[in-house]
């Protein structure tokens, strides 16, 4: 990925994010995530989508499920550019967890899961560990996670 390119320009060239790109296209979010931002994206990789129950991804990609898909995807986006260092500071300053307001208006939590790792938690108690952090983009930053987190 190239820091001079935006989130979408980089994601479409990532072999590990083909499912995410297909979902972003189906939800009509390409224009938004190509915009100036800045955005912090907690980006599930293909393996994260593979962990969902069989048939979930094809079902979400159907036009009639665009609203649900948009809600899930925007739950992975936080306004602003939050580096791993920013996330660690927020977690350390708040007793081991930090609350983030997502682009869909709901809350995600960042929690320490070890001395070296943070995870993103949803309201249902599901977590996506940050496996790759600080993938800088012209309009934000991507942190790759190993599970799809879901809004209420």
List the predicted regions and their residue ranges.
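Mature, structured domains of secreted/extracytosolic soluble proteins
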Residues: 1-152
């Amino acid at each position: 990925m190239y820091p001079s390119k935006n989130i979408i320009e980089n994601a479409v060239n990532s072999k590990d994010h083909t499912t995410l790109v297909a979902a972003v296209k189906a939800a009509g979010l390409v224009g938004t995530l190509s915009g100036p931002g800045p955005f912090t994206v907690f980006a599930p990789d293909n393996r994260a989508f593979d962990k969902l129950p069989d048939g979930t991804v094809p079902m979400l990609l159907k036009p009639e499920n665009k609203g649900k898909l948009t809600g899930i995807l925007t739950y992975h986006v936080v306004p602003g550019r939050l580096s791993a260092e920013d996330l660690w500071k927020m977690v350390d300053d708040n007793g081991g967890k930090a609350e983030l307001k997502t682009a869909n208006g709901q809350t995600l939590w960042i929690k320490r899961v070890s001395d070296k790792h943070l995870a993103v938690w949803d309201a249902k108690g599901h977590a996506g560990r940050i496996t790759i952090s600080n993938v800088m983009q012209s309009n934000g930053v991507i942190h790759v996670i190993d599970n799809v987190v879901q809004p209420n």
